[in-house]
Amino acid sequence: MIRFTEENGALIAHSRNETIRIEGWGNNALRVRTTLLKKLPQDAHALTENVAHSAKVTIAEGGETAEIVNGKIKATVNGVGIICFYKDNELILQEYYSYYYGSIRKEAICYKIRSREYKGLASDDFKITVRFESDPKEKLFGMGQYQMPILDLKGSVLPIEQRNSQVSVPFVVSNKGYGMLWNNPSTGEAAFGTNITKWISDESDMVDYWITADDTPAQIVTNYTECVGRAPVMSKDYLGLWQ
């Protein structure tokens, strides 16, 4: 079972070998970090900007579940560590967990597949996989620039790495009213299947992702750029420059 605590407005969950930290990070947004290491890494990665939030943590009586709310978005964690996200109290994203006790999915719970998987490497890092339930009717957009004639990414598998003619920006916007950043600088893969969604990091010391919920894609992107930074306005001195 998991033990829940609150630390400076963040929801902390400790299991036997994993630490989960969920905290407000900007407007209507949450940052989720989990690790098997004794100390949670403090790297900001892409979340470079100082942003305010109004997150509030509630731990249920008896300590079996907990939640954190920041504006329009809410995250809940149950006794085995399954994280669910809600926009205005409507479920928008749920971790995939099929491992008997504690499972909350409607389909089979006997696959022995956990939401977050850490495979040890010859270092303090892991190959990390995070799984989410998939809505086959969902539409997904973003992820940078890939050489393919596909707008809706549902059903696509995308390598997360920079290549000649490919720019990977692991931020995706859903028509269900949320945007998610895979906040990890390592190479990896994003698989947006109709039956399961997977984010994979080839080598990392923690799970790290950021999620926001809002009413329009423009508001979602605004929340995102508030946290990762915005390009400065070009000086008029450079307008009309020919090279």
Where are these regions (language model features)?
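N-terminal accessory segment at the very beginning of proteins
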Residues: 1-238, 243
